[in-house]
C-alpha cells in the first residue's frame, strides 16, 4: 500500500505531520504498513525546482495507490504567469493528470460546536450533515478557448453527456447510502451547459428510483444553504458552482480546519478543504483535524479500511466533545491547544477507543 505524500505550502507540512502520526497508530493497531513516498508540489516545488509540478512528483503520484496532499499556494507566487502558479500549474495540473473528476466534501456540524457556527443555533437545528459532489474535470476552469489581453478576458464553459453522467452516478451512489436525496444545482434558465446538465441528470436519476432528485438554481442554492442547510443531503453540481458552494457550506461548522475532502479519479487525491493559510504557517496553531479526517477518507475509499476510518472520525469527535480546541474554533484563543497538541490528543484517543 503506497501513499504519495505531498505536504505542499503554508500550513500543509504541519498538518500533514499530525495526520501521519495518526496513520502510525493505525499501522501499529492493524499490523499493516503503508509505504509513504514524499514529493513536492506548488510553491514548494517552484522554490526548489522552478516548476509547480516536477516530473519526479508526477512519477511518485502515478506509482502510488493514493495521493495525500497538504495545501498549495500563497501570495509569494501570485506574480508568476498563471500557468506557472502553484494553483494552476500545480494543483489543477495534477487533477488533470490523474483524471480526477469528482470532489467529495462532507460537511458536518458537531453538536458540541454548534455555537461556533456563524449561523444561529435555530438555523443549524439538530445539526447539519451534507456532502457536496462537485464535478472537477470540466467546466469553465478547463474549457477552451480561453485567454486574456489588454481589452478582454474570456473563458468557456463546456459540459458533455459522458462527463455529466459520470458525476451524477457518483452523487446518486453516495446518496443511496445516506438519506437518499440528491439536489442538483445548475443555472439552466440561462446557460446552455446547464440545460444539458439538467437533462442528463434527470436521465441518470431514473436508474435510482429510491433516491429523490430535486433541481435548484445556483443563486437560490446559495441562499438556501444559509436559510436552511439541514434540508440538503447530497448536493450535485458543476466545477465552478461547486467551488463556490462547497466553500460556502464549509463555513457552516465555523472553520475550514474541520473539513476534509477527496477527489476521485484514476487515483484518488485526499486533501483538507481549506487553503495554505500562509499567515499562520510555522506557528503551530493551525487546525489539523481536516487533514486527519482526509486521512480517514483515504483509508476508507482507497484502502477499504472502513472500520479504521470510523474510529479516526470517532476519536476526533470525542476530543472535540472533551473541550479541546485549536485557535480557529476556540472561544478563548488563549486556552487553545497547538497543532501538535491536537494531533497528540487525537492519537491518544484513538489508542484508547481501539
Swiss-Prot record:
CC terms in the record's Gene Ontology section: cytosol
Signal peptide: none
NAD found in the keyword field: yes
Cofactor: Mg(2+); Mn(2+)
GO molecular function annotations of the record: 3-isopropylmalate dehydrogenase activity; magnesium ion binding; NAD binding
EC number, as in UniProt: 1.1.1.85
InterPro entries: IsoCit/isopropylmalate_DH_CS, IsoPropMal-DH-like_dom, Isopropylmalate_DH
Location (main, coarse): cytoplasm
Keyword Hydrolase included in the entry's annotation: no
Chain positions recorded as substrate binding sites: 95, 105, 134, 219
Site feature (Important for catalysis) residues: 141, 187
Top-rank taxon: Bacteria
UniProt: Mg(2+) binding residues: 219, 243, 247
Binding site for NAD(+): 74-87, 275-287
Reactions catalysed according to its record: (2R,3S)-3-isopropylmalate + NAD(+) = 4-methyl-2-oxopentanoate + CO2 + NADH
GO biological process: L-leucine biosynthetic process
Pathway: Amino-acid biosynthesis; L-leucine biosynthesis; L-leucine from 3-methyl-2-oxobutanoate: step 3/4
Keywords of the record: Amino-acid biosynthesis, Branched-chain amino acid biosynthesis, Cytoplasm, Leucine biosynthesis, Magnesium, Manganese, Metal-binding, NAD, Oxidoreductase
Enzyme category, top tier: oxidoreductase
Cofactor: binding details: Binds 1 Mg(2+) or Mn(2+) ion per subunit.
Subcellular location field: Cytoplasm
UniProt record similarity statement: Belongs to the isocitrate and isopropylmalate dehydrogenases family. LeuB type 1 subfamily.
Known partners and oligomeric status: Homodimer.
Entry function: Catalyzes the oxidation of 3-carboxy-2-hydroxy-4-methylpentanoate (3-isopropylmalate) to 3-carboxy-4-methyl-2-oxopentanoate. The product decarboxylates to 4-methyl-2 oxopentanoate.
Identification of the protein by name: 3-isopropylmalate dehydrogenase
Gene: leuB
Amino acid at each position: 500500500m503506497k501513499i504519495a505524500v505531498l505536504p505542499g505550502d503554508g500550513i500543509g507540512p504541519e498538518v500533514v505531520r499530525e495526520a501521519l502520526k495518526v496513520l502510525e497508530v493505525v499501522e501499529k493497531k492493524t499490523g499493516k504498513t503503508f509505504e509513504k513516498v514524499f514529493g513536492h508540489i506548488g510553491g514548494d516545488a517552484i522554490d526548489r525546482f522552478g516548476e509547480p509540478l516536477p516530473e519526479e512528483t508526477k512519477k511518485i503520484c502515478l506509482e502510488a495507490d493514493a495521493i495525500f496532499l497538504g495545501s498549495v499556494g500563497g501570495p509569494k507566487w501570485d506574480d508568476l504567469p498563471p500557468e506557472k502558479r502553484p494553483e494552476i500549474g500545480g494543483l489543477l495540473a495534477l487533477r488533470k493528470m490523474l483524471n480526477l473528476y469528482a470532489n467529495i466534501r462532507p460537511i458536518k456540524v458537531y453538536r458540541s460546536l454548534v455555537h461556533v457556527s456563524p449561523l444561529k443555533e435555530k438555523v443549524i437545528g439538530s445539526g447539519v450533515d451534507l456532502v457536496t459532489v462537485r464535478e472537477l474535470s470540466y467546466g469553465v476552469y478547463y474549457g477552451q478557448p480561453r485567454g486574456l489581453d489588454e481589452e478582454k478576458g474570456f473563458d468557456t464553459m463546456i459540459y458533455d453527456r459522458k462527463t455529466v453522467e459520470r458525476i451524477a452516478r457518483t452523487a446518486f451512489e453516495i446518496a443511496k447510502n445516506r438519506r437518499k436525496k440528491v439536489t442538483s444545482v445548475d443555472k439552466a434558465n440561462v446557460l446552455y451547459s446547464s440545460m444539458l446538465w439538467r437533462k442528463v441528470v434527470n436521465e441518470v436519476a431514473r436508474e435510482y428510483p429510491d433516491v429523490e432528485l430535486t433541481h435548484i438554481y445556483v443563486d437560490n442554492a446559495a441562499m438556501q444553504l444559509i436559510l436552511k442547510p439541514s434540508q440538503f443531503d447530497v448536493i450535485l453540481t458543476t466545477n465552478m458552482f461547486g467551488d463556490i458552494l462547497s466553500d460556502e457550506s464549509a463555513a457552516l461548522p465555523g472553520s475550514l480546519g474541520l473539513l476534509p475532502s477527496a477527489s476521485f479519479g484514476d487515483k484518488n487525491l485526499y486533501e483538507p478543504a481549506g487553503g495554505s493559510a500562509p499567515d499562520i504557517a510555522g506557528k503551530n496553531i493551525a487546525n489539523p483535524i481536516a487533514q486527519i479526517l482526509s486521512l480517514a477518507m483515504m483509508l476508507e475509499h482507497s484502502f477499504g479500511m472502513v472500520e479504521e476510518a470510523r474510529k479516526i472520525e470517532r476519536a476526533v469527535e470525542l476530543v472535540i466533545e472533551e473541550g479541546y480546541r485549536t485557535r480557529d474554533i476556540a472561544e478563548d484563543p488563549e486556552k487553545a491547544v497547538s497543532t501538535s497538541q491536537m494531533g497528540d490528543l487525537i492519537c491518544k484517543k484513538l489508542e484508547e477507543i481501539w
